[in-house]
Amino acid sequence: YATSAVRDAENKEDFISEVERLGIDFHVITGETEGKAAFLGATYEMKGNDKFLVIDIGGGSTEFSYGLPNTIPEVVSINIGTIRFVEMLREMTYEQLEIHIHEMLSKSKLLEKIKQLNEEYELIGVAATITGQVFINKKINYNPKISHGYRLSIEEIKGNFNELYNMSESERLLIPSMHSKRVDVIVPGTFLLYQILTFFNKNEITCSEKDLLEGHFITTYL
């Protein structure tokens, strides 16, 4: 499956043709499909009547999925993502990026509705930009048993950003869990996560190691 990076690529059709030529079964999924699968994967084992807002930060887009466990959620895909921000930061400051993020979030009727609700709901974060914050904060190697279910505070996220922002890429590589392909995108990704919590006036987000892949498996085989 391919997500935002391929959906938005100028050479999307050429890329798909080349992959199919190799005999690989390949599908480009919509942001809505991506969000629904991530929501199902993250909430499948949840019980009760609590609502969840599942957040999946990607390279080109971020999916927000809202609803009760084991139901079809309301989904919106916003074109804010880590790779997209790396490119934008070549021409703007983080102060300008903050304004841009909040403007993009505010344009969504669904997100504005959720923001104004008086009902209780919990944030769940999936994918490496969010779950990886745990290991950056603790300075340890990746271990899903530690990150799954971890309640990540907004203070931890802000602390991670301040630390990462003041590091060179070579210094970030010394963080035990840091992958070489993430040394540039992790900084704007952490900033985006912080701004999302600020937008919804939330103090924490629960990390989940179960997301899109688990959601697809559940819908296909269960």
PLM segments and residue spans:
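Acidic, divalent-metal-coordinating active-site segment for phosphoryl/phosphodiester hydrolysis
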Residues: G59-Y66
